UniProtKB/Swiss-Prot annotation:
Keywords: Cell membrane, Ion channel, Ion transport, Membrane, Potassium, Potassium channel, Potassium transport, Transmembrane, Transmembrane helix, Transport, Voltage-gated channel. Heterotetramer with KCNB1. Does not form homomultimers. The transmembrane segment S4 functions as a voltage-sensor and is characterized by a series of positively charged amino acids at every third position. Channel opening and closing is effected by a conformation change that affects the position and orientation of the voltage-sensor paddle formed by S3 and S4 within the membrane. A transmembrane electric field that is positive inside would push the positively charged S4 segment outwards, thereby opening the pore, while a field that is negative inside would pull the S4 segment inwards and close the pore. The lineage of its organism: Eukaryota, Metazoa, Chordata, Craniata, Vertebrata. Residues 1-182, 244-254, 307-321, 414-491 are cytoplasmic. Residues 205-220, 276-285, 344-357, 378-384 are extracellular. This is Delayed-rectifier potassium channel regulatory subunit KCNS3. SUPFAM superfamilies: POZ domain, Voltage-gated potassium channels. Residues 358-369, 370-377 dip into the membrane without crossing it. It is a multi-pass membrane protein. Belongs to the potassium channel family. S (TC 1.A.1.2) subfamily. Kv9.3/KCNS3 sub-subfamily.
Length: 491
């Protein structure tokens, strides 16, 4: 018996509602169900058409006035007890999420759970939420890696319909999957080396030995390295573009966009240098060239093509924009509050460097992020107390969203590793053969037809081959058994 359940005997004048839930039949007073009109059973009594009734139950018998529900009959006892007592108790034998789904189906809010079960229910729900988060993340990683692998296989199938499809397919696989074969690994290592060489050359070019009063000095060695790197980047992008199965999808890939952006500054600088000789506005052209040269730093993003960690970081930031937004919001509020407070107590001290609110913004930023350069600091006692509070609040504010972001990064990192493992096999996986199609109705009809034919072959005439009367079949079986017995006796 359900905890708190009691027997309710309807009055003689009360109309009963017949319920059949998974084979468990119960008659309930209408007044009992109407105590909670917003639940499923309460809404059922307000329906005025059969269509409306069938939207709330699985079936309805007009003759018996009985409502059928294909739900858990054991849990329905708890639901029925809720209508009698007004309190819902948790079914211990049922999973907490299944229980939640069941009461949601019946339209019962969790707020009706009695106090004796509420705390235990919430604890089990939170505990299962944590377990479900880990399991769901692993399942999502596996499922997503399988889906992306399936997308990659579909892209490979497109090459069969393209011109020079097999050649383009081989090139595409080696360019996209560094672990596919030895040649693919060599291409990936070469590309990574060129990216690192380009970054090193850019950093060396900024040293004082390569600077003069007019600007940078064109060193022939560094210039040769730059041209060689750009030639490699351009050739790599061109090969990927030519071998791609779909041009539109190619330009939607962020990694391909990064490859294109990384070579734009070089060619734009060449164009500006060419026009600089013909243009009179040399100063403005020089600034444009400097800006374009600074854009070469975007080449470091090309490492994302060869780094699982960078791709995971990008996916984490893309899917954690809510947490990142909260982090920025918390920091902005804290910086605004503490900058005004520190300014109000430090402005009258002539030895303090916190003389304006914008300067206090900088101080509050490096204090809340626990960087603490030391270039600006409070000198008064009240200012130091405010600074201590600012640092403590900064630690708490930054730590809260960072934990969530770190957990997501771990999951996406594992997902990217699963994708790389799935795509590193030398031979694409074979397609699973399609399962044979069987029509059970046709098979049954063929068996019945064969049975009727066998009856005719032994001298039994079936008057109506399409008849499905069970009595006629039994009579035929008796005749068939009698004929068989006579044959055996004769032998």
């Amino acid at each position: 018996m359900v905890f708190g359940e009691f027997f309710h005997r309807p009055g003689p004048d009360e109309e009963l509602v017949n319920l059949n839930v998974g084979g468990f039949k119960q008659s309930v007073d209408q007044s009992t169900l109407l105590r909670f009109p917003h639940t499923r059973l309460g809404k059922l009594l307000t329906c005025h058409s059969e269509e409306a009734i069938l939207e709330l139950c699985d079936d309805y018998s007009v003759a018996d006035k009985e409502y059928y529900f294909d739900r858990n009959p054991s849990l329905f006892r708890y639901v029925l007890n809720f209508y009698y007592t007004g309190k819902l108790h948790v079914m211990e034998e049922l999973c907490v999420f299944s229980f939640c789904q069941e009461i949601e189906y019946w339209g019962i809010n969790e707020l009706f759970i009695d106090s004796c079960c509420s705390n235990r229910y919430q604890e089990r729900k939170e505990e299962n939420h944590e377990k479900d988060w880990d399991q769901k993340s692993n399942d999502v990683s596996t499922d997503t890696s399988f889906e992306e692998s399936s997308v990659f296989e579909k892209e490979l199938e497109k090459f069969d319909q393209l011109r020079f499809g097999q050649l383009r397919k081989k090139i595409w696989i080696r360019m996209e999957n560094p672990a596919y074969c030895l040649s693919a690994k060599l291409i990936a290592i070469s590309s990574l080396s060129v990216v690192l060489a380009s970054i090193v050359a850019m950093c060396v070019h900024s040293m004082s030995e390569f600077q003069n009063e007019d600007g940078e000095v064109d060193d022939p060695v560094l210039e040769g390295v730059e041209i060689a790197c750009i030639a490699w980047f351009t050739g790599e992008l061109a090969v990927r573009l030519v071998a791609a199965p779909c041009q539109k999808k190619f330009w939607k890939n962020p990694l391909n966009i990064i490859d294109f952006v990384s070579i734009i500054p070089f060619y734009a600088t060449l164009a500006v240098d060419t026009k600089e000789e013909e243009s009179e506005d040399i100063e403005n052209m020089g600034k444009v060239v400097q800006i374009l040269r600074l854009m070469r730093i975007f080449r470091i993003l090309k490492l994302a093509r060869h780094s699982v960690g960078l791709r995971s970081l990008g996916a984490t930031l893309r899917h954690s924009y809510h947490e990142v937004g909260l982090l920025l919001l918390f920091l902005s509020v804290g910086i605004s509050i503490f900058s005004v407070l520190i300014y109000s107590v430090e402005k009258d001290d002539h030895t303090s460097s916190l003389t304006s609110i914008p300067i206090c913004w900088w101080w509050a930023t490096i204090s809340m992020t626990t960087v603490g350069y030391g270039d600006t600091h409070p000198v008064t006692l009240a200012g130091k107390l405010i600074a201590s509070t600012c640092i403590i609040c900064g630690i708490l504010v930054v730590a809260l969203p960072i934990t969530i972001i770190f957990n997501k990064f771990s999951k996406y990192y594992q997902k990217q590793k699963d994708i790389d493992v799935d795509q590193c096999s030398e031979d694409p996986p074979e397609k699973c053969p399609e399962l044979p199609y069987f029509n059970i109705r046709d098979l049954y009809a063929q068996r019945v037809h064969a049975f009727i034919t066998s009856l005719s072959s032994v001298g039994i005439v079936v008057s109506d081959p399409d008849s499905t009367d069970a009595s006629s079949i039994e009579d035929n079986e008796d005749v068939y058994n009698t004929a068989s017995l006579e044959n055996c006796t004769a032998k």
